[in-house]
């Protein structure tokens, strides 16, 4: 059974729902494309877990992007995904990163952009300042602004595994603050080691053994890159043929690299002629 799963659960006697995600292989696949410093490895793990949790809240088929931008040492960290829990991500940085640096110190003056793109319907975008010390706190602020529902998020990553939990009041009439605060206090006792080492059922039992919890079937989370030779050919087609021919003459080929999975697609003069004559370029992938 895959270690990479998202688990949704409900409390039978409270209008509160929860999610728990545990990631290993998909997390490692994202990290394997680049040699990231430890701080970015952990940040991408937290961001990946967060995106998985957010994706499970979507009520439509479509895509999600959670992007952190700033003017600090880390300029970009992004995880893109969809309602099928297929995720990919990348980060950009400059120079050495300080050990123990907070989110604000890593990104400087920055913001988080969450973009929801339904397969049908209008795109929604929410923006939250990166003015908290943790990614989890910034995401809680996003939920406060966008859904106005009390939400608690916990995120963990160590470069090998990533995990997260989300606790949220269900939309309903009445005041459920007391119920939520009680469950929030229980959830806050979870340790990273428990999420990394134990099965989800055992984690939930340890946290809520006095509560009645309904656990749904797990949803597998995978790394999935959307790059392709066809997409690269389409990008080449947006540049003038004269400019492309010049590059071919100087370099012998055009290399199109994917930042997410580090795959390189090579196009030679024959491929380019095929692209601009609207015929399919030969399949060549390195």
Swiss-Prot record:
GO cellular component assignments: cytoplasm
Compartment(s) where it occurs, according to its Swiss-Prot or TrEMBL record: Cytoplasm
PTM comment: Under oxidizing conditions two disulfide bonds are formed involving the reactive cysteines. Under reducing conditions zinc is bound to the reactive cysteines and the protein is inactive.
InterPro entries: Heat_shock_Hsp33 (IPR000397), Heat_shock_Hsp33_C (IPR016154), Heat_shock_Hsp33_N (IPR016153), Hsp33_helix_hairpin_bin_dom_sf (IPR023212)
Gene Ontology biological process terms, A to Z: protein refolding
Major subcellular site: cytoplasm
Entry-linked Gene3D superfamilies: helix hairpin bin (1.10.287.480), Hsp33 domain (3.55.30.10), HSP33 redox switch-like (3.90.1280.10)
Disulfide-linked positions: 225-227, 258-261
Keywords: Chaperone, Cytoplasm, Disulfide bond, Redox-active center, Zinc
GO MF annotations in UniProt: protein folding chaperone; unfolded protein binding
Domain of life of the source: Bacteria
UniProt keyword Aminoacyl-tRNA synthetase, yes or no: no
Entry function: Redox regulated molecular chaperone. Protects both thermally unfolding and oxidatively damaged proteins from irreversible aggregation. Plays an important role in the bacterial defense system toward oxidative stress.
PANTHER family: 33 KDA CHAPERONIN
Family indicated by similarity: Belongs to the HSP33 family.
Protein name per its UniProtKB record: 33 kDa chaperonin
Species of origin: Shewanella sediminis (strain HAW-EB3)
